[in-house]
Amino acid sequence: MTQHSPYSSAMAEQRHQEWLRFVELLRQSYDKDLHLPLLQLMLTPDEREALGTRVRIIEELLRGEMSQRELKNELGAGIATITRGSNSLKSAPVELRQWLEQILLGAQR
């Protein structure tokens, strides 16, 4: 009997479709001004806090004034979380990075 890995291509595709479904649900919730209640329903307080921390990590990485170790101490995040953020930012599309710089750093320039 073949056991299916939770990371099989069929499972990965299903998870991707579920993610896209959530993203579309979130998009639609903005049209009805229900995005905050939806996110409060879908995310635990810890998950919401983690997302806020990740935004700060990306913001500080874009600013480029602190080392990853300084970020770890400043934000109380694990070095692995900061490294993942850094790696994700490096592989992000140029348009996304430019948009993030404009949104997160624009008021400070």
Swiss-Prot record:
Which Gene Ontology cellular-component terms appear in the entry? cytoplasm
Q: Where in the cell is it found?
A: Cytoplasm
| GO biological process per UniProt | negative regulation of DNA-templated transcription
Q: Name one GO molecular function term.
A: sequence-specific DNA binding
Instruction: Name the major location.
Output: cytoplasm
Instruction: Quote the DNA-binding region ranges, renumbered to this chain.
Output: 68-91
Pfam families in alphabetical order: Trp_repressor
List keywords of the entry alphabetically.
Answer: Cytoplasm, DNA-binding, Repressor, Transcription, Transcription regulation
**Quaternary form?**
Homodimer.
Q: Which HAMAP family does the entry link to?
A: Trp_repressor
The family classification in the record reads:
Belongs to the TrpR family.
Query: What's this chain's function?
Result: This protein is an aporepressor. When complexed with L-tryptophan it binds the operator region of the trp operon (5'-ACTAGT-'3') and prevents the initiation of transcription. The complex also regulates trp repressor biosynthesis by binding to its regulatory region.
This chain belongs to the protein called Trp operon repressor
Q: What is the scientific name of the source organism?
A: Enterobacter cloacae
Gene giving rise to this polypeptide: trpR
